[in-house]
Swiss-Prot record:
Optimum pH is 5.5. Its main location: membrane. Mediates an active uptake of hexoses, probably by sugar/hydrogen symport. Mostly transports glucose, and barely galactose, xylose and mannose. Keywords: Membrane, Sugar transport, Symport, Transmembrane, Transmembrane helix, Transport. This is Sugar transport protein 9. It is found in: Membrane. It is a multi-pass membrane protein. The chain crosses the membrane at residues 19-39, 86-106, 120-140, 143-163, 170-190, 204-224, 292-312, 324-344, 351-371, 390-410, 429-449, 454-474. CDD domains: MFS_STP. Belongs to the major facilitator superfamily. Sugar transporter (TC 2.A.1.1) family.
């Protein structure tokens, strides 16, 4: 035994249901995954906009003034302004609050309705921002964008996990993260283009957020609902027909029976929130739905994603160079997510988590050291082109490690481990914890950089080390395991089995899903 680590047996185990991978289910999941464009576009656009001089002079003149007059005593503090950070981070407070409402809507009315509400809110918010004349309009727009993100991030990963066959669930679910990374890259490219405009480039950047919102709204009309959601609302025949359609087979009796068993168990739960917090058998789901989004944000990734242009500018990159560097990291993000799509259902979740964690630790330490050697604690100094290239290279290495590990798996794993009766509540916890810590990082990163200086990168590297150990000892492999049979995986884990009663296991057969290594 190596530290109690577990892996899947036979590709993850689980019942082998009838049917295969149909074009219909792949196209459905691709359309649904476009919900990630909302989140990704916002992550990418805000940092570029807040580095544009016209935007700063109109809404945040104090930041613009101190940047030009170099009033601050250190380069680390160039952009340290709470109101400026509130523009970026306010979205995530709204997303946090709306995720709880989205949980109830998703359970009662289906996953599609949540996607529709999210798209409409994001559309209205993008218009507020594009036509903003004061900071109040900007903040209101950001709050509406947050409602959109909260609804989309709550419903889309659940939708993808429920539609996809178990053997390719990871790859299809990561389509959501892929859409996020594409949204970030598109936003970075748009920011670079609009920064060349003589006037109102920031309005174009913020207003184009309406495009992914429209895609989301249209998608919510054309997508079918999931069999799980139909069963929750008593539509048994429609659920069977949909299952036959997405699996491409008439004989879906075994899988349909497991879904019905899970649905019957769900009906016995009057209050999913009370159960997930109080019943021991839901302890693994509660821990991972809370810990994984916390760890995902404490990697520091969103520092790179929505403050990349500001960060590169702080380090001495010229205006164009800072935006181009953000485009480069965005492109690395997209390509590396493709690696995850290829590997997640072949090699499993654990190996990606562990390798990506080690890669991020090394990268953060090197970046912190390079910045410390050039700027020290005073913040005085300049980057040579060679040092700037090395910093950019290791930031790209860090982004790559995140993009094939904590990025996609941070959404995939929580969405595939919760039984139906607590699934909306579990995903709401996942989204709300994610948004809360995204808010904290967004609101205080520039202040942390001002006070912790290059040591901030050591802080993030240390946190990645902690979470890598957490994954090694506590996360079993979930590759290829049907969602309705996750109870069997927890039952055979050396730590989590103490919380799992015999009736927590759904599904026939005596398959072993995990084994010690």
């Amino acid at each position: 035994m190596a530290g109690g680590a577990f892996v899947s047996e036979g590709g993850g185990g689980g019942n082998s249901y009838e049917g295969g991978v149909t074009v219909f289910v792949i196209m459905t999941c691709i359309v649904a995954a476009m919900g990630g464009l909302l989140f990704g576009y916002d992550l990418g656009i805000s940092g570029g906009v807040t580095s544009m001089e016209e935007f700063l002079s109109k809404f945040f003149p104090e930041v613009d003034k101190q940047m030009h007059e170099a009033r601050r005593e250190t380069a680390y503090c160039k952009f340290d302004n709470q109101l400026l950070q509130l523009f970026t981070s306010s979205l995530y407070l709204a997303a946090l609050a709306s995720s709880f409402v989205a949980s109830a809507v998703t359970r009662k009315y289906g996953r599609k309705i949540s996607m529709f509400v999210g798209g409409v809110a994001f559309l209205i918010g993008s218009l507020f921002n594009a036509f903003a004349t004061n900071v109040a309009m900007l903040i209101v727009g950001r709050l509406l964008l947050g409602v959109g993100v909260g609804f989309a991030n709550q419903s889309t990963p659940v939708y993808l996990s429920e539609m996809a066959p178990a053997k390719i669930r990871g790859a299809l679910n990561i389509g959501f993260q892929m859409a996020i990374t594409i949204g970030i890259l598109i936003a970075n490219l748009i920011n670079y283009g609009t920064s060349q405009m003589a006037k109102n480039g920031w309005r174009v950047s913020l207003g184009l957020a309406a495009v992914p919102a429209v895609i989301m709204v249209i998608g919510s009309f054309v997508l079918p609902d999931t069999p799980n959601s139909m069963l929750e609302r008593g539509k048994y025949e429609q659920a069977r027909e949909m299952l036959q359609k997405i699996r491409g087979a008439d004989n879906v009796d075994e899988e349909f029976q497991d879904l019905c068993d899970a649905c019957e168990a769900a009906k016995k739960v009057d209050n999913p929130w009370k159960n997930i917090f109080q019943q021991a058998k839901y302890r693994p789901a509660l821990v991972f739905c809370s810990a994984i989004p916390f760890f995902q944000q404490i990697t520091g990734i969103n520092v790179i994603m929505f403050y990349a242009p500001v960060l590169f500018k702080t380090l001495g990159f010229a205006d164009d160079a800072s935006l181009i560097s953000a485009v480069i990291t965005g492109a690395v993000n997209v390509v590396s997510t493709l690696v995850s799509i290829y590997a997640v259902d072949r090699y499993g979740r654990r190996i990606l988590f562990l390798e990506g964690g080690i890669q991020m630790i090394v990268s953060q330490i090197v970046v912190g050291t390079l910045i410390g050697m050039k700027f020290g604690t005073t913040g005085s100094g300049t980057l040579t082109p060679a040092t700037a290239d090395w910093i950019l290279a290791f930031i790209c290495l860090y982004v790559a490690g995140f993009a094939w590990s904590w990025g996609p798996l941070g959404w995939l794993v929580p969405s595939e481990i919760c039984p139906l009766e607590i699934r909306p509540a579990g995903q709401a916890i996942n989204v709300s914890v994610n948004m809360f810590f995204t808010f904290l990082i967004g609101q205080f990163f520039l202040t942390m950089l001002c006070h912790m200086k290059f040591g901030l990168f050591y802080f993030f590297g240390g946190m990645v080390a902690v979470m890598t150990v957490f994954i090694y000892f506590l996360l079993p492999e979930t590759k290829g395991v049907p969602i309705e049979e996750m109870g069997r995986v927890w039952k055979q884990h050396p730590f989590w089995k103490r919380y799992m009663p015999d009736d927590a296991v759904i599904g026939g057969g005596e398959e072993n899903y995990v084994k010690e290594v």
